[in-house]
Design a protein with these regions (language model features):
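Substrate-binding/access-modulating region of protease and related hydrolase catalytic domains
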Residues: 1-36, 46-49, 55, 73-81, ...
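Hydrolase catalytic cores
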Residues: 13, 51, 65-146
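Structural recognition of the beta-strand scaffold that forms the well-ordered cores
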Residues: 14-18, 38-41, 60-63, 69-70
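Secreted peptidase-domain scaffold signal
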Residues: 20, 141-158
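Residues that line or immediately flank small-molecule/substrate-binding pockets and catalytic motifs
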Residues: 41-44, 116
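A generic "binding-loop/recognition-motif" signal
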Residues: 45, 57, 64
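Substrate-binding/active-site groove segments that recognize
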Residues: 59-60, 135
Length: 158
């Protein structure tokens, strides 16, 4: 798997994976723990770490992933929790960044995400939150988007 991830990274593909939902004592899970992958952990609406999130030096960044409202088959909805939902959130931010600046490499995208994240937990990068909670607006502004354009791109649909 490591060779496939390295090849994808070399071709310019930004790889994102959920850190896992096995708890603090779980070993790192792959592909999230691979150096070519952006490992994402989950937070709740109060920016607290999801209790069952995996932890470790490989965790890059956090995003909302607790009590996410999801559609179910038919016309109903349910609440769900997990680092996979946080990874989807980061995938959306990466899509916005690459739409604005498609020439960015995977490493550049990682730097944008981590440098614009808002620190949570222990000061600086840590095993729980990585660089902190991702910020789509700040990520877009950091690569040259005008604040009004970044705000429009990150605003929830009405």
């Amino acid at each position: 798997m490591a060779r496939a991830l390295a090849a994808a990274h070399k071709k310019g593909i930004v790889l994102i994976a959920a850190a896992g939902n096995a708890g603090a004592k779980s070993p790192p899970l792959y592909p999230a723990a691979d150096t070519n992958v952006i490992a994402v952990t989950a937070t709740d609406s109060q920016d607290r770490l999801f209790q069952m999130s995996n932890r470790g030096n490989h965790v890059a960044v956090a995003a909302p992933g607790v009590d996410v409202l999801l559609p179910t088959p038919g016309t109903s909805y349910q609440m769900a929790t997990g680092t996979s939902f946080a990874a989807a959130h980061i995938s959306g931010i990466v899509a916005l960044v690459l739409e604005r600046e498609p020439s960015l490499t995977p490493d550049s995208v990682r730097r944008v995400l981590l440098s614009t994240a808002h620190d949570l937990g222990a000061a600086g990068r840590d095993k729980d939150f990585g660089a902190g909670i991702a910020d789509a607006y700040d990520a877009l502004v950091s690569i040259g988007a005008k604040p009004a354009d970044a705000l429009q791109a990150t605003r929830a649909p009405q």
